[in-house]
């Protein structure tokens, strides 16, 4: 199943590349976060406002820790980034998931190119940038609160900004979170 999905996605990308058409961002408004046991801080189920279909959104540019303890190597890698223990990393994972759910309680906007983020969901995951009801970038909120590391795939943003400038902005927010001992940074001596 996953192999077939991957082949399909790669085939679509190859077709678009052959046609010389870049994948443009699409704006999907009035989206709703929906509960699912696999939701975490950077990957979660969404009901789209346009067609009411369910997708799994995976944030571009950031990575929140895993709460599922079966992924020990990944948790250890994420903890090493922050300089914290496995237990602290899992605690931050739960905080990040709750933070995201709270921030997305009101309808929000999804910007996506419908690029596959792989993953284990039967729905498939697509990379997204999320703008909250308060017009805040969810990536920035997670990083400035010490709940996510700067990580993941890179792309030009929906508003045309270069990813290097955006990543520099995230780095500023991360430095501030470290100084103020927010989120995972509170555990660092």
Label the predicted regions:
Residues 1-5:
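Positively charged n-region of N-terminal signal peptides that target proteins for export
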Residues 7-13:
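Bacterial N-terminal signal peptides
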Residues 16-189:
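Small beta-barrel nucleic-acid-binding modules, primarily SNase/OB-fold domains
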């Amino acid at each position: 199943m996953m192999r077939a999905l991957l082949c399909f996605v790669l085939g679509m990308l190859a077709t678009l590349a052959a046609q010389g058409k870049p994948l443009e961002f699409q704006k999907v408004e009035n989206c709703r976060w929906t509960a699912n046991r696999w939701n975490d801080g950077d990957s979660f189920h969404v009901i789209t406002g346009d067609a009411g279909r369910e997708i799994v959104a995976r944030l571009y540019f950031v990575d929140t820790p895993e709460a599922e303890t079966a992924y020990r190597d990944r948790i250890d890698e994420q903890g090493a980034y922050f300089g914290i223990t496995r237990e602290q990393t899992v605690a931050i994972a739960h905080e990040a998931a709750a933070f995201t759910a709270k921030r997305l309680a009101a309808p929000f906007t999804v910007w996506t190119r419908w690029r596959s983020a792989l993953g284990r969901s039967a729905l498939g995951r697509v990379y997204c940038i999320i703008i909250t009801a308060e017009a805040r970038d969810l990536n920035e909120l997670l990083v400035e609160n010490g709940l996510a590391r700067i990580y993941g795939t890179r792309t030009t943003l929906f508003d045309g900004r270069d990813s290097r400038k955006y990543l520099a902005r995230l780095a500023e927010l991360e430095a501030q979170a470290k100084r103020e001992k927010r989120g995972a940074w509170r555990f660092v001596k």
